[in-house]
Structure formats: C-alpha cells, structure tokens
Amino acid sequence: MDYLQKKSIRSVAAAIAGFLRHCVRKIGITREKLPSCIALAVCPLVTFYLFEMYTHNPFTTMHFKTQILNMAFYVLTALLLFGIVKYVRVALMLQTAFFMAAGLANYYVLNFRSAPIMPWDIYSIGTAASVAGNFNYTLKGSTVLVIIGFLILLLIESRFHMKTPARVAKRAALILLSMALIYGYTGMVQSESFVRNFGLYDKLFTPTVMNKRDGNIVAFLMELEYMDVEKPSGYSPEETGSKYTQAGQDSAGLTAAVEDPESVKRSNIIVIMDEAFSDLAVRGDFTTNEDYMPFIHRLQQGAENTRTGYLNVSVLGGNTANTEFEFLTGNTIGFLPQGSVAYQQYVQKETPSLASYLKELDYHTVAIHPYYASGWDRDRVYPLLGFDEFLSQDDFTNPKRIRNYISDESSFAKIIELYENKKEGEPLFVFNVTMQNHSGYEEEFHNFTPDITVDGIDSKALSMYLSLVKQTDSALQGLIDYFSQADEDTMIVFFGDHQPTTYVSNPILRNNKVNPETLTDEENLLKYKVPYVIWSNFDIEEQTDGETSANYLAMDVLENCDLPLPALQSSLTGLRKEYPVISAAGVREADGTLTTVKQCGEALNDYRSLEYYLLFDYER
C-alpha cells in the first residue's frame, strides 16, 4: 500500500473517529448507555457484511481497506438516522430493514440480468414490474442464511433504548454533522484521484465486478457521478450544428432524395430486433442433440443476396431499449452514463432516426412490440423518433404464445399482414422488437417443452434458451421464404438485442475450463456479440464475416438499399474505417486493437459532440 493510499485511509478514519468522539461528548456516555453506543458502532458493520453476502463473500472479493471504507458509510448513515428518529433501536432497525430489502432486490436483479442495481434503474421500475411475474424467485440456501442473519440482527437491535439528547440544538448538530460527512464521503469516492490512489475498481462497463471489489454502496455512489451527461470538451452547439448540417449537404444524393422521394429506389425495409437472440457458440464450444439455429447457420456459410456477421452491442441480459436506440439513431451508449436508458432519460424531443429519415422519403413507418406499449416508454418515444404507427400486444388477435409471450411466428405474421394491407406504391419500414425469448428460462410451461439438450451440461436454463432460439430460427426462415416470393423489393434485417443473462451461458464457459469471474478483456467482449443477417429478394453484395456495432448497422442497411446516408451516418463513414466497432462494452480499432471509449479520448470527440447535439440541442 503506497503513501497516498495510507493517507486516504487515515484521513477517513480520523474524520469518523473525531466525529464519534464529538457524539460521545455531546450524548454523555453513562454505564446504561454504553451498550447502545457499542451497538450504534457495531450493528452497521454487521449490516454491511450481510448486505454484501447476498451476492458475494466480501472477505474474499474485497480488500480490508475497502471493507473499512464501506463500513464508514454505514456508521454515518446510522448516526444520521439516530439524530432524526431519536431512538437508537429505531435508527438501527430502519437501516437494517432497508438493506435487508435492498440487498434481496439486488440479488434478484443480478440473477435476472447479470448486473446489479444501478442509479438509473429508477427509470426502469415500470418495465421491470411488467415482466416480474416471469422469473424464478427460488432462494439459494446461502441467501436464506443471510435473511436469517438480518432477522437475528433486527431482534438484537430492538433491545437498545438510548435516545438522542433532548436539546434540539444537539440533535440538529448531530444531523448536520452526519449529513456533512456523508456529503464529503460521497464526493471523496467520486474523486478520480481518490479512486486511483485508494485502488478502487472503476471499470463501469463491468458493474458486477465493480460491486464485488468496491462494495455495493461505494460502487453505487461512484456511479451516481455519471447520472448527467457531460458536455464534450470544446463543445459548441452552433459549431456542431453547422457540422451536422454540412454533413447532410455533403451526403451524395441526400438533398435530392428528400426533395423528391420518388427519384430514388425505395425498397421495403423490415428490421427485426429479436429479444435475447444470440449464438452462444461465441462463448465456447458445446455440442447439442440437434442444431439450434440451422437456418441462420446455413446463411452464415454463404447465401445469395445475404450478408451475415456479428453485431457488438452495449448491453447484456437486459436494457433492450439501448440496442434499438443505437440502431435507430446511430448514436452510441458508449458516450452515455453506464447503465442509463437513453429512451427514458435522453429522448425527450424529436430526435433524428432511421424512422424519421425514411419517413422523409415517404415511407410508412411502423414499430411493433408484442408486449406492453409502455415498456421503456416506447409509446412516448416512438413518435419522437418518427414512427407513424406503433402496434403492441393489444393489436394482436389470438396470437400463438410460447411460455407467457407472443411467439416470434405470430410477431412475424403481423409483418406479413402489414405488407399485404399497405397502400399500393407506398414503401414500408417495419421495426419489430420481439418478446418470445425473454428471460427467465428455468420455469416449466404447459405450452412449451424444450427439445434441445447439451452434451455434458445439465442446465435447464440453457436447454430452454437454445430451444427458444430454434423456434426463432424457424420463424425467420418462414418469413424469408414468404418474401422470397413477394413482388416488391424487400430487405429483411435480423439481429439480437443482447445475449441472455450469464446464468444461461456460464455453464458453457465452465465446460470449456473458463472461469466466468476471471475473463480477459477479449473474453468479456464476447458477452456482447450477437449474430446479424441482412437478406433481400433483390441483388446485394454477399458477405459472411461482417463485424460491426449497433450504431453502424443502419448504414449497411441504407447502403445496400442504394439510399443516401442521412447527416449523422454520413459524418461517421470516415470514423468507421478507423473504429469499425464502437460500443459501451469496447471499441475495436482498424488493426484489431481492443480499447474503450474512455481510452480513445479526443479521437471520438467529434462523434461525441454530434451525439450530444442531437440529444440536447437539436431542433427540427
């Protein structure tokens, strides 16, 4: 431990010790009050350890100095509560009950989406509640023991009866000092110099590791700093707006196409972002009783008028809306706070997107999501992105269901229905976000029996997931078969929004002798890869080894449809050659080097400025 680290620890310890001495003097410790004072110092520490044990063993994942750092917060909040509620037992029991409930919630969230609770999840409560009934809430034995530990602690805390000083001034002093120290503590753990000198783990794109190493509270407070999007260095809305306008003017054929849409070829464009669809073979080798995606695997071997490859996305196991945000807008989540949901936080006005651009070309733009319309605020956001129409589960009549969700087969049938009933001569753009493959994967259902098994791996979740993927593969084949016979030129774009939560894929890693807890940066990036397919019933150049990211994929769609690129995509053509993959999970340089958005720094500043402008300063 270097000098600065030791100095940081001593500073924290000295501040808290001085504060406690002040409290002792003000309260006036007597023999009767001594047990309560000890409880006020010790019980918060027990609460800390129990809270961490919901998800990991802090004695093995956290340095002792980091444990001390976390304990300080618990002691300070206990003192603050003591000042507010007057009774030590009430203060301690309130703190313990809160962390017992919050820890259990964090345990479930981590299991369901492979990421802990983060500050931005407050925006997602409604969406989470809508799918809450589809998960398995069985507790592990170790988790039950943690809950029992909390209950015992609550019982012990109920026996202490010390009150705060009767004088209002002393209580106020205790409250104000506690608040001041908590405020200072928060600022300290958000300080880059403290994080660096203390040795905290600050890789926000791996929040699970961050929580295990830094502790849940310290990690949460560090993440709070990123609630707001900082302006890029040297940002000027006037200058950036001028660059954006110029990029549109420089895009070959864009102005003419917008002024006279009939002057360009306008094929129907169908985009399917399939829920949790991925090929877990990218994580490691495994053998199944039969191919779980035979149709897509055949396309990946090479097919006429077909382009296949892998898409790098910014999310894992959840936050679906961020992948659609990247695809539709051309922006990247990599410039936004880790864990944020762009739809709910940043799309508050009309925002340029693929839908709004195609609408300018007189396309009829339709979004489909066969679940609740309010999920991720889609019913509010889609009109702002330029969609003419939004069809949710309420617009399906007697659809086929797999488990509790509308099947991909029925979801794709809705696309065919739209095509067959569209106005003659009006091109159609459909963006379909499916639900069939949504987690969880451990329940049994009367209407679906998994038929894929994995040799040497006994995992109900993995078997369920691969069996669902097979259903999607079959539905996609049916859709492409239909449009291969269609009279109008049509392109179908298919990709997954993210891989499933890691409890599905971890058995594959372990079967390949890979520890999921000690992945290299390259291995970690594999968690963010999903396959994509671009197919058309007209001539396009074939490809089988594509590697891109969600923010760039719409460029491929437009270019292969012979449509001009809109302003943002036009401005990114040069950058894409230097950085063919940009996501929150990682950046791939042209020579194959893996880096991060943060490490790229000024190299991405023009892109960052354009994104900031479009989200916060752009006006149509």
Can you name each region flagged by the protein language model?
Residues D2-M210:
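Transmembrane and membrane-interface helices of multi-pass
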Residues T186-V271:
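Membrane-interface segments at or immediately adjacent to transmembrane helices
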Residues R21-C37, T127-V131, V146-E192, G234, ...:
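Solvent-exposed, charged interface segments at domain starts and junctions
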Residues A252-V264, M273-D274, D279-R620:
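Solvent-exposed soluble domains appended to multi-pass membrane proteins
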Residues I122-I125, D214-F220, M293, A321-E324, ...:
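Alpha-helix initiation and N-capping motif
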Residues R113, D121-G133, G141-L145, M222-E225, ...:
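Short alpha-helical interface patches
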Residues R113-P119, Y137-G141, S233-A247, T320, ...:
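General structural signal for secondary-structure boundaries
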